[in-house]
Each structure stands twice: as C-alpha cells, then as structure tokens.
C-alpha cells in the first residue's frame, strides 16, 4: 500500500544519506515544497485531494520551482501514464514497487544537492 511504499522510500533515501520531507497529499506536498525548497521531488500519482499529475503541474508552473526535477511514482506502468507525467513536466517515472537501487539511481541522476520530498 501507499504508506508501506512511502515508508520504504523514506528508509532507502535516509540510508543513502539524503534528507527526506514527507507529504500526506498533494496540497501538503505543495506547502512542503514551498517551505523546504527541495532539490528533487518524488510525486506519487495516486495522492489524495490533489493527484500527482496536478501537483507536478502546479510545481512546474511556479518559476521558483520549475527547475526542480520531479520523478513520478506509480503502480501503473503504462505508456499513457508515463506520457501524461511528461506532459505535466516530470523528468522521470518509477514504477512501484521499486528497489532501493532504482530509487537511489534516480536520485543520483537528478539530484543536485539538498532535500527530497
């Protein structure tokens, strides 16, 4: 479930030496992005209240955060889902469940220092 995946991602990232800020839903994510100015954002597509696509689009429309890489997370592995993520501005897409290695590889590829939400 989402809490298990979120907790696993948090553990993997902390073990990799990264600072992690978690959000409960899309609105919480937007507030935390504003407060913490992360260098990389992981965005679950199926977040409550404001889904990951909407959250990513709002982040990318904000000039302050448009440059921040967003990696979408989803249990769906369809071409349409990946294309929709690209259309709203995400840089990459990880399919759940993902391994620690896949998650940290994505961080290494996109992170320029700082925290991940």
Description of each model-found segment:
Residues 36-42:
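Active-site beta3 strand of CheY-like receiver
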Residues 47:
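Receiver (REC) domain active-site loop signature in two-component systems and cognate sites
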Residues 98-108:
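C-terminal output helix
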Residues 3-21, 35, 110:
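Two-component/phosphorelay signaling modules centered on CheY-like receiver
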């Amino acid at each position: 479930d989402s809490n298990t995946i979120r907790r696993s991602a948090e553990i993997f990232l902390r073990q990799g030496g990264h600072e992690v800020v978690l959000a409960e839903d899309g609105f919480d994510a937007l507030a935390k992005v504003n407060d913490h100015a992360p260098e990389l954002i992981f965005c679950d597509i199926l977040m409550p209240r404001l889904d990951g696509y909407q959250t990513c689009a709002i982040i990318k429309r904000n000039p302050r955060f448009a440059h921040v890489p967003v990696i979408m997370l989803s249990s769906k592995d369809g071409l349409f889902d990946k294309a929709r993520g690209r259309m709203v501005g995400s840089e990459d897409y990880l399919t759940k469940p993902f391994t620690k290695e896949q998650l940290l590889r994505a961080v290494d590829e996109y992170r320029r220092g700082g925290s991940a939400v």
